[in-house]
């Protein structure tokens, strides 16, 4: 019996969104592209909720495209040109989109609505997204993270909290009540030039902040600012980490005790943050997508995605798409696993569970090697999926 899981990379292009099957990492398949809704733009952002991709762009009039990712499972003759399944047009251009998968809300930021602050969209029905208000009180947000709070501050347990990177500061906003979002606090730091993006540690005690333009403005090596946010009402600057090279930081994400940083000409840097509470961060690896230099310029890596169950990491940027894996993992195929059942033939029910990778198909053979079962469709409520 075999069971297989699928992983897809969704990569923003200047003229659309590319879909790549990376389930077999040494034999990837370009499945096709969803063209931009309007005109080309080098800025395009994609997030996923319940098997749907939500896509925004800085292109004028673009709005938010919705694409059903289950269509990728049976692409007969790749690459194909796809069409969107739904569209939301209550804003035009947007720099970014943030989704809280726990609540079913999307937050478009950097639009022409709500002073560039968060534009709330209810996506609980992905094919019929609806406007749900917004937050304009702190001006333009470039990027954000939104969570159902489960950190150390008892005052905000279970509430929906927004951490917005707002060019010259980070804002913390309670967005639980979409009709009345409330500013909780702001985070400031020295030598600010452009507060670009930030991400929480998994224990929610610290926020890692990237300033996109400080390396050029002040001559720093790559700098990451760390704020203590264990008390949301009273966050404070904690310390700053400087990398080994001069290149510009762009987006960074935490997985476990590692911080994966898109570092433009420096490629992707991997930083150990296991001792962050003692103001220590240590680079432990990197993959350089722009080997020509590590200068302060906008060449190289724009983004990284380290959250696949397989351990594969997607890097995207001016050089295109790159798929890498930690040297701690081998290249052997982990997506297909075979096992036997006793007795064979089996009777009654067989229950299959996967602790990490979702199960997409099951193939069963009898003792003669004949295929007796081939199932590739499962009730959505009986399994979870990750793209």
Which residues does each PLM region occupy?
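C-terminal outer-membrane/trafficking sorting elements
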Residues: 334-386
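Feature marking well-ordered beta-strand scaffolds used for ligand recognition
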Residues: 1-329
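Single conserved hydrophobic/aromatic residue that forms the stacking wall/gate
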Residues: 2, 386-387
């Amino acid at each position: 019996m075999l069971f297989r899981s699928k992983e897809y990379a969704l990569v923003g292009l200047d003229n659309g969104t590319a879909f790549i099957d990376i389930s077999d990492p040494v034999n990837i398949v370009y499945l096709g592209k969803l063209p931009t809704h309007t005109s080309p733009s080098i800025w395009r952002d994609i997030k996923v909720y319940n098997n749907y991709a939500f896509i925004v762009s800085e292109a004028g009039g673009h709005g938010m495209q919705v694409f059903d990712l289950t269509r990728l499972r049976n692409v007969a003759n790749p690459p194909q040109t796809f069409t969107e399944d739904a569209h939301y047009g209550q804003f035009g251009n947007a720099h970014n989109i943030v989704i809280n998968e726990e609540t079913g809300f999307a937050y478009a930021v950097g639009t022409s609505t709500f002073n560039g602050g968060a534009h709330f969209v209810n996506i609980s029905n992905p094919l019929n997204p609806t406007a749900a208000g917004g937050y304009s009180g702190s001006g333009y947000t470039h990027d954000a993270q939104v969570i159902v709070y489960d950190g150390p501050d008892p005052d905000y347990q279970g509430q929906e909290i927004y951490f917005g990177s707002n060019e010259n500061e980070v804002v913390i906003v309670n967005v639980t009540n979409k009709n009345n979002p409330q500013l909780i606090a702001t985070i400031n730091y020295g030598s600010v030039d452009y507060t670009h993006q930030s991400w929480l540690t998994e224990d929610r005690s610290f926020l890692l902040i990237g300033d996109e333009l400080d390396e050029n403005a002040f001559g720093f090596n790559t700098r990451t600012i760390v704020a203590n946010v264990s008390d949301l009402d009273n966050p404070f600057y904690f310390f700053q980490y400087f990398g080994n090279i001069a290149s510009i930081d762009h987006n960074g994400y935490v997985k476990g005790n590692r911080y994966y940083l898109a570092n433009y000409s420096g490629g992707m840097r991997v930083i150990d943050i296991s001792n962050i509470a003692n103001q220590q961060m240590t680079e432990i690896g990197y993959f350089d997508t722009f080997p020509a230099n590590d200068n302060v310029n906008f060449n190289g890596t724009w983004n990284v995605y380290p959250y696949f169950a397989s351990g594969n990491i997607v890097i995207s940027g001016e050089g295109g798409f790159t798929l890498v894996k930690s040297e701690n993992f081998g290249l052997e195929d982990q997506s297909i696993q075979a096992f036997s059942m006793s007795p064979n033939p089996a009777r009654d029910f067989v229950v299959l569970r996967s602790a990490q990778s979702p199960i997409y198909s099951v193939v069963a053979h009898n003792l003669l090697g004949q295929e007796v079962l081939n199932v590739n469709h499962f009730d959505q409520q009986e399994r979870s999926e990750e793209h």
